[in-house]
């Protein structure tokens, strides 16, 4: 992001491509032993969706120079069209939503719910999307000594 911020401050048009958000050749899941070979890194759908391409550190005039964001999929490890689709989808849907949704209107929960519809379109089209979005995610609260219990919440797509 630093390079894009500097360019905007110098009044250059900027397309943001921060690798930790939009490099789609990174693994889309932590379960890499079942994944096709990738360059490394970890970039799940939720991380792509969390991108805010217009950094808050810029003033209003500087923000005008941020004209968008771009996803990158370097293909040195991509061996087929099916693998290319797998690495792109549904992360490309998340990046699209980042681009056309105002930050105040973004909602990860709403986007997760819309993924069910998007996936039905992928199925009709016969494209190979990443099924890792169905993995079960666990969240937990660390208890205080007085509580003596741990609350674990399990969720998956649309739940």
Where do the language-model regions lie?
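Substrate-binding groove of N-acetylhexosamine-processing glycoside hydrolases
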Residues: 1-158
């Amino acid at each position: 992001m630093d390079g894009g911020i500097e360019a905007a401050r110098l009044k250059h048009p900027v397309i943001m491509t921060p690798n930790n958000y939009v490099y789609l050749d990174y693994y889309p899941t932590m379960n890499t032993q079942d994944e096709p070979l990738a360059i490394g890194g970890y970039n799940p759908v939720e991380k792509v969706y969390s991108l805010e391409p217009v950094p808050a550190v810029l003033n209003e005039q500087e923000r005008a120079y941020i004209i968008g964001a771009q996803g990158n999929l370097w293909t040195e490890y991509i061996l087929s069209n099916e693998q290319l689709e797998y690495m792109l989808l549904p992360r490309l849907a998340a990046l699209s939503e980042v681009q056309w949704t105002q930050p105040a209107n973004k909602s990860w929960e709403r986007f997760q719910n819309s993924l069910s519809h998007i996936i039905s379109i992928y199925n009709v089209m016969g494209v190979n999307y990443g099924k890792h979005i169905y993995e079960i995610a666990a969240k937990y609260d660390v208890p205080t000594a007085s509580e003596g219990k741990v609350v674990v919440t399990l969720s998956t797509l649309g739940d």
